[in-house]
Amino acid sequence: MVDDSTRKTLSNIPLLQIRAGPREKDIWVQRLKEEYQALIKYVENNKQSGSDWFRLESNKEGTKWFGKCWYMHNLLKYEFDVEFDIPVTYPTTAPEIALPELDGKTAKMYRGGKICLTDHFKPLWARNVPKFGIAHAMALGLAPWLAVEIPDLIEKGVITYKDNC
């Protein structure tokens, strides 16, 4: 199910060990530390390989995440807002990543711009609780979704390039 490139990407993202969600206030801070370390490592790896494609930050509690992601298509950079909340049942439940400005533009999306990850990503996440975290959700959830959906939306004329100069 996982190709060699994805397997290599995954092997370079640290696995998490602490099983805690926002409800476990005492150990949630430790889980957040692991999350940030994994995200930093993933972003560093992406930069080194020339495939830097997102920026994320969170609120103080680490329960709301937001930022930008981008996809290069025909040498043009398509940029989107990305956001998600950490579910109270995290890490058992994966975050639902949303690209609000694409809401309603593809069938592979739920209300509010939440991308569809049901068939491929969620079973993989479930098998890897608590080892997978936000970096894994970006690598195995959002990245492949962008790679499939954005070129299709561009081809159909649903989204167009915006010059940000």
UniProtKB/Swiss-Prot annotation:
One cellular component term from this protein's GO annotations in UniProt: cytoplasm
CDD domains with a match to the protein in the record: UBCc_UFC1
Pfam families recorded: UFC1
Organism superkingdom: Eukaryota
Keyword terms, alphabetized: Ubl conjugation pathway
GO biological process: protein K69-linked ufmylation
Active site per database record: C116
Matching InterPro entries: UBQ-conjugating_enzyme/RWD, Ufc1
Chain ranges passing through the membrane: none
Molecular function terms, GO-annotated: UFM1 conjugating enzyme activity
Summary of the function given for this chain in its UniProt record: E2-like enzyme which forms an intermediate with UFM1 via a thioester linkage.
Family statement drawn from the similarity comment of this UniProt entry: Belongs to the ubiquitin-conjugating enzyme family. UFC1 subfamily.
Protein name: Ubiquitin-fold modifier-conjugating enzyme 1
Species name: Drosophila virilis (Fruit fly)
